Curated annotation (Swiss-Prot):
Stored SMART domains: LH2
Gene designation per UniProt: Pnliprp2
Protein name per its UniProtKB record: Pancreatic lipase-related protein 2
Keyword list, A-Z: Calcium, Cell projection, Cytoplasmic vesicle, Disulfide bond, Glycoprotein, Hydrolase, Lipid degradation, Lipid metabolism, Membrane, Metal-binding, Secreted, Signal
CDD domains in the cross-refs: Pancreat_lipase_like, PLAT_PL
Length: 468
């Protein structure tokens, strides 16, 4: 908010109350769109000609080369590969990004591996590659263009808006919010990928993405730290039916802080440094893309706070189940039971980012108290995990240690576990320690696996435990 206000003061004031752009209607520069604390500057969005929004259609039949379609030229749709019996997913980029190639096309191609779909990449680069404040105002025109295309699909081709899914990253999240508002919430689904904070957070619902914009709105927050001083580009405000906050929503694993991120101006980010400066912000669309091919690896846990989630207070999933973050969030039966449902999960730091959550309880056995740490690995019918530290400190016989772990692979049905301990101290008496019982509980369904052993082992020697 503060950054938008500062930038606004540096620009000249534009007079007038509204500007009209033909079939898209008129756009006011008065409240709540402008003249607010978060948006003090009364400027207009650019014209459709200046923004030059393009709709690039990819389908299973043309996964590599787009077909440009236009709402003002319906024949471009009729003679394209657009299929009326398929769902249509629009993907909209954000600030200084583009709609051709890159992550948008990659997301389409992942969709083609799991479904027959019309995938439309929305390119509004000419409207996004300007000062941030102007780009934020331009989102209204881009949203209007999308809404008009959906209306043409409905009136000219009988295609229901309920079959439309709008996906938007950063400023693109508010673009699709505007489109949904103009379609009076009849769009089937909207997904906001780290909706942009500056010029939007705290504003009335008609200005930003909100749950009334679609029949179902899901949001992934990955950069929700305050814009000042942490340069968090994303909203912390909950704006969907389901609001996912992976890793707490502020700092993503694998995104390292750097000195540049503390001094760079949002209007000065250049394309080649996006991953360097905005790593957290970009994680949202990377998580979504990965979820398409890994539907079970992003299970979220409804919880009131990340602290409670980390304390395992929201584990396992309740009887009604847990929602999946990303592509399959709409499979959750309770998705629209209420708005602003808060969901937490942890992810990996690289690769496909997937994780599976378990609660592990270890009961120790041995002759005397030792100090050190204990590790446990899970072995299942789908593979085995790496070793995870369960406890570090005083290791007392009969003591029980509990910890939740986020496992790097889906091991499936757990068949055995392996225990290891170490204190990294040379001991001539070669003491032994073991696990008499290890209980593993799955977060998905609460199922418990119990493993037992009467053995003890020396440090750095694996102990295998089998079902009791």
């Amino acid at each position: 908010m503060l950054l938008c206000w500062i930038v606004s003061l540096l620009l000249a004031t534009v007079g007038g109350k509204e500007v009209c752009y033909g079939h898209l209607g008129c756009f006011s520069n008065d409240k709540p769109w402008a003249g607010m604390l978060q948006r003090p500057l009364k400027i207009f969005p650019w014209s459709p000609e200046d923004i030059d929004t393009r709709f690039l259609l990819y389908t299973n039949e043309n996964p590599n080369n787009y077909q440009k379609i236009s709402a003002t030229e319906p024949d471009t749709i009729k003679f394209s590969n657009f299929q009326l019996d398929r769902k249509t997913r629009f993907i909209v980029h954000g600030f200084i990004d583009k709609g051709e190639d890159g992550w948008l096309l990659d997301m389409c191609k992942k969709m083609f591996q799991v479904e027959k779909v019309n995938c439309i990449c929305v390119d509004w680069r000419r409207g996004s590659r300007t000062e941030y404040t102007q780009a934020s105002y331009n989102t209204r025109v881009v949203g209007a263009e999308i809404a008009f295309l959906v209306q043409v699909l409905s009136t000219e081709m009988g295609y229901s808006p309920e079959n439309v899914h709008l996906i938007g990253h950063s400023l693109g999240a508010h673009v699709v919010g505007e489109a949904g508002r103009r379609l009076e919430g009849h769009v089937g689904r909207i997904t906001g990928l780290d909706p942009a904070e500056p010029c939007f957070q705290g504003l009335p619902e008609e200005v930003r993405l909100d749950p009334s914009d679609a029949m179902f709105v899901d949001v992934i927050h990955t950069d929700s730290a305050p814009i000042i001083p942490y340069l968090g580009f994303g909203m912390s405000q909950k704006v969907g039916h389901l609001d996912f906050f992976p890793n707490g929503g502020k700092e993503m694993p694998g995104c390292q802080k750097n000195i540049l991120s503390t001094i760079v101006d949002i209007n000065g980010i250049w394309e080649g440094t996006q991953n360097f400066v905005a790593c957290n912000h970009l994680r949202s669309y990377k998580y979504y893309a990965s979820s398409i091919l890994n539907p079970d690896g992003f299970l979220g846990y409804p919880c009131s706070s990340y602290e409670k989630f980390q304390q395992n207070d929201c584990f396992p999933c309740p009887e009604e189940g847990c929602p999946k973050m990303g592509h399959y969030a709409d499979q959750f039966e309770g998705k629209t039971a209420t708005v602003e449902q808060t969901v937490y999960l942890n992810t990996g730091d690289s690769g496909n980012f997937t994780r599976w959550r378990y609660k592990v309880s270890v009961t120790l056995s041995g002759a005397k108290k030792l100090s050190g740490y204990i590790l446990v690995a899970l072995y299942g019918n789908n593979g085995n995990s790496k070793q995870y530290e369960i406890f570090k400190g005083s290791l007392k016989p009969e003591a029980r240690h509990v910890r939740d772990i986020d496992v790097d692979i889906n091991v499936g049905e757990i068949q055995k576990v392996k225990f290891l301990w170490n204190n990294k101290v040379i001991n001539l008496f070669r003491p032994t320690l073991g696990a008499s019982q290890i209980t593993v509980q799955s977060g998905v369904d609460g199922k418990e696996y119990n493993f037992c052993s009467s053995d003890t082992v020396r440090e750095d020697v694996l102990q295998s435990l089998y079902p009791c």
